[in-house]
Curated annotation (Swiss-Prot):
Residues 112-162 bind DNA. The gene is NTL8. Residues 245-254 have a biased composition (Polar residues). The lineage of its organism: Eukaryota, Viridiplantae, Streptophyta, Embryophyta, Tracheophyta. Keywords: Activator, Cell membrane, DNA-binding, Flowering, Gibberellin signaling pathway, Membrane, Nucleus, Stress response, Transcription, Transcription regulation, Transmembrane, Transmembrane helix. This is NAC domain-containing protein 40. It is found in: Cell membrane; Nucleus.
């Protein structure tokens, strides 16, 4: 370690207010770049640690610069599988879960690297409990998957206070925030080791399955909705409901559910296409099952209809005759 690095560490330890707080660009362009180039003296203030062999509350002890809520490390981003594309991010008691997308770090108009945010969860995915430990992973632009990265570890001091307040207010968050009982104390460490002892392989495998499943849920759902058979059944059902009486309340419920599904999946169909689908569906299914089925003949009049028609014609004739006689009588009386 150089004299400048030793002096920086000594100053930060002795004098309050002196902090090591580099920007994202400085971490990538200066520290990570010089570390990769082999200039160890310029980056001696940052320790090289295999982060995923430690729990987050144990990492502050491995840092060269002591702090209360922020620490820095160099780490090789290993592969989860020899020929896989996923990184190894599981520890003995939990796993680091990536949140959001990988963001670009720019120096002016030039992209110098990428930044990814990870949150530590205790337990197995997808039922892990989120903690206040957050890590930002910085990588040089265009580096391979298993390249060296620099990590900024942070402890969210407001996490426990906000979780306690929301529990008192009766609010349960969707992401399952649970206040971490760990810390830097030995008693809390023993609690995690006794209650959350989990093999690394199981955590890595379950985390991999959940991430892959989450990435493909939307695509699978969209492919199912775009299937021609399901489209035909859906449109035929809607059209058939328009031709038979239904309970108004039930009809409103079906209509609201159908409209919500269409708005969610982005399916837009015109009324003409609906009627065409229904006609094809009826011809294919009804005609296929009953060979004697034919379209009704509008000119074929039943016997009951002909009798009713004759009665109507006779009644009309009698009414016109009475009306004509009345007017004829009035006309003769005036003359």
């Amino acid at each position: 370690m150089s004299k400048e690095a030793e002096m920086s560490i000594a100053v930060s330890a002795l004098f309050p207010g002196f902090r090591f707080s580099p920007t994202d660009v400085e971490l990538i362009s200066y520290y990570l770049r010089r570390k990769i180039d082999g200039d160890e003296n310029s980056v001696a203030v940052i320790a090289e640690v295999e982060i995923y062999k430690f729990e987050p509350w144990d990492l502050p002890e491995e840092s060269k610069l002591k702090s209360e809520n922020e620490w820095f490390y160099f780490c090789a981003r290993g592969r989860k599988y020899p020929h896989g594309s996923q990184s190894r991010r599981a520890t003995q008691l939990g796993y680091w879960k990536a949140t959001g997308k990988e963001r670009s770090v720019k120096s002016g108009n030039q992209v110098v690297g990428t930044k990814r945010t990870l949150v530590f969860h205790i337990g197995r995915a997808p039922r892990g409990e989120r903690t206040e430990w957050i890590m930002h992973e910085y990588c040089i632009h265009g580096a391979p998957q298993d390249a060296l990265v620099v990590c900024r570890l942070r402890k969210n001091a407001d996490f426990r206070a906000s979780s306690t307040q929301k529990m008192e207010d009766g609010v349960v968050q969707d992401d399952g925030y649970v206040g971490q009982r760990g810390g830097l104390e030995k008693e809390d460490k023993s609690y995690y080791e006794s209650e959350h002892q989990i093999p690394n392989g199981d955590i890595a495998e379950s985390s991999n399955v959940v991430e892959d499943q989450a990435d493909t849920d939307d695509d699978c759902y969209a492919e199912i909705l775009n299937d021609d058979i399901i489209k035909l059944d859906e449109e035929a059902l809607k059209a058939s409901q328009a031709f038979r009486p239904t309970n108004p309340t039930h009809q409103e419920t079906i209509s609201s559910e159908s409209s919500s599904k269409r708005s969610k999946c982005g399916i837009k169909k015109e009324s003409t296409e609906t009627m065409n689908c229904y006609a094809l569906f009826r011809i294919k299914n009804v005609a296929g099952t009953d060979s004697s089925w034919r379209f009704p003949n509008p000119f074929k009049i039943k016997k009951d209809d002909s009798q009713r028609l004759m009665k109507n014609v006779l009644a009309t004739t009698v009414f016109l005759a009475i009306l004509f006689s009345f007017f004829w009588t009035v006309l003769i009386a005036r003359n």
